[in-house]
């Protein structure tokens, strides 16, 4: 008889992988010969090939934000922010950068681009977008998404998103990403023509696979748990930072009272007046310095927020793997059931209770011709099922191989970026404390001269 189907637990196992390098700040994607282009992992996405745009070093920047008013899909007036994307070639003959393209994009178009990338590159940890509305704010920080300071931080975040995509070894070659940077008119139509919405996995299907998969890959299970814990840790860190910022702001501003009191005191003193006046001035400078300090802190908070949102990108890769594993297990079960049914027809023995067995007892046995016809149909279905299982197995192996390579690349990037951000934050705190020491040292000298 036919051999038993392979164990789904052992199907999606990759070989040893070499980690890839992390992204840089400038797009540098070298594309091979004109006819080299293939479709990425059979997903049906044309990679960028034979285009001189990618053969040069390109600087990408989101240089400006502008508030605009227009009509939305239901013909209602709305206010939104548009962002100016500029791409420049930095390999000009005289060494100067040359503007090649500039166009305006809304935040919703950035979202559309990322959703497309998530569907067509499910094995990639797709870079996240900056927050659409402010989170983890302290009382002085506005939660309004039209606030100029928030819009500026989001502009920086959108530029960082484009640089992340442009420096990714796979995403940078995508045709839709290229058109996002260069095609101002009808870009949405170009994206929708790819039909990516139809290929997106439903949330219900993904949730079903999460709970019903029988043999999940332990590495992806651990990765999902890690992403949950990473998100939790960074969330708590950002909440602590917001509370500290609130209190620090109050402490610094209260020092302004020193300045006012010293100034009032200096008015009634003759010999001590100048010293008190100078000390009060130093206290005023100290009190006002907190605004710039906390503005700089927001930069480091945004770096942490990026990896807060990266946690969801990691989970998206895990969900896709669970879906593929669940489909593989379902195909293996269907194949095993058909083989058992074929064996029962061939031997005339029924190993388990079935409706067919009951009808046979009630209405009599099938004729040999009917049995042979059913066996033939089942054998054809078994052959198709084996081919389908083999195809799903190969697809799953390729997904695991590519996904794990990108996860290793992401880990290197994460370790490097977070290390740099935390060190820079510590240096900034040290600098802030030194400035405080300097203020009080100056005040001491003022008191000494009285």
Curated annotation (Swiss-Prot):
Disulfide bonds: none
Biased composition (Low complexity): 11-20
Any single GO BP term: protein transport
GO molecular function: epidermal growth factor receptor binding; insulin receptor binding; leptin receptor binding; phosphatidylinositol binding; phosphatidylinositol-3-phosphate binding; transferrin receptor binding
GO CC annotation, single: cytoplasmic dynein complex
Domain notes: The PX domain binds phosphatidylinositol 3-phosphate which is necessary for peripheral membrane localization.
Protein name, as recorded: Sorting nexin-4
The organism of origin for this protein: Mus musculus
């Amino acid at each position: 008889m036919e051999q038993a189907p392979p164990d789904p637990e052992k199907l999606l196992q990759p070989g040893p992988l070499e980690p890839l390098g992390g992204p840089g700040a400038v797009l540098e994607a070298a594309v091979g010969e004109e006819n080299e282009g293939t479709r990425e992992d059979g997903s049906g996405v044309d990679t960028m090939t034979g285009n001189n745009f990618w053969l040069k070093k390109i600087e990408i920047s989101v240089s400006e934000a502008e508030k605009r008013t227009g009509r939305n899909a239901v013909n209602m007036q709305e206010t939104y922010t548009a962002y100016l994307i500029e791409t420049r070639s930095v390999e000009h003959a005289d060494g100067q950068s040359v503007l090649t393209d500039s166009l305006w994009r809304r935040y919703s178009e950035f979202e559309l681009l990322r959703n497309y990338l998530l569907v067509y590159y499910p094995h990639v940890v797709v870079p996240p977008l900056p927050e659409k509305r402010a989170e983890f704010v302290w009382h002085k920080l506005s939660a309004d998404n039209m606030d100029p300071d928030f819009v500026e931080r989001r502009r920086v975040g959108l530029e960082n998103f484009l640089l992340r995509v442009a420096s990714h070894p796979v995403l940078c070659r995508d045709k839709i990403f290229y058109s996002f940077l260069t095609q101002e008119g009808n870009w949405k139509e170009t994206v929708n023509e790819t039909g990516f919405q139809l290929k997106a996995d439903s949330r219900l299907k993904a949730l079903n696979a999460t709970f019903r998969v029988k043999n999940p890959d332990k590495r992806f299970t651990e990765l999902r748990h890690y992403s949950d814990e990473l998100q939790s840790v960074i969330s708590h860190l950002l909440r602590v930072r917001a509370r500290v910022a609130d209190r620090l702001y109050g402490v610094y501003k209260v020092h302004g009272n020193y300045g006012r009191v010293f100034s009032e005191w200096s008015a009634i003193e003759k010999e001590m007046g100048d010293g008190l006046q100078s000390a009060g001035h130093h206290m005023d400078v100290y009190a006002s310095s907190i605004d710039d300090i906390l503005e700089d802190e927001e930069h480091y908070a945004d770096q942490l927020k990026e990896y807060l949102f990266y946690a969801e990108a990691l989970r998206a890769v895990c969900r896709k793997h669970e879906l593929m594993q669940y489909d593989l297990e379902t195909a293996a079960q269907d194949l095993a059931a058909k083989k058992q049914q074929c064996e029962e027809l061939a031997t005339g023995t029924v190993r388990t209770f079935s409706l067919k067995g009951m009808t046979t007892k009630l209405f009599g046995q099938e004729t040999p011709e009917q049995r042979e016809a059913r066996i033939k149909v089942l054998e054809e279905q078994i052959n198709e099922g084996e081919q389908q299982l083999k195809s799903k197995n190969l697809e799953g192996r390729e997904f695991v191989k590519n996904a794990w390579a990108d996860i290793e690349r992401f880990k290197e990037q994460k370790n490097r970026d977070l290390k740099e951000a935390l060190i820079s934050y510590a240096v900034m705190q040290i600098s802030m404390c030194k400035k405080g020491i300097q203020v009080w040292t100056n005040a001491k000298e003022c008191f000494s001269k009285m």
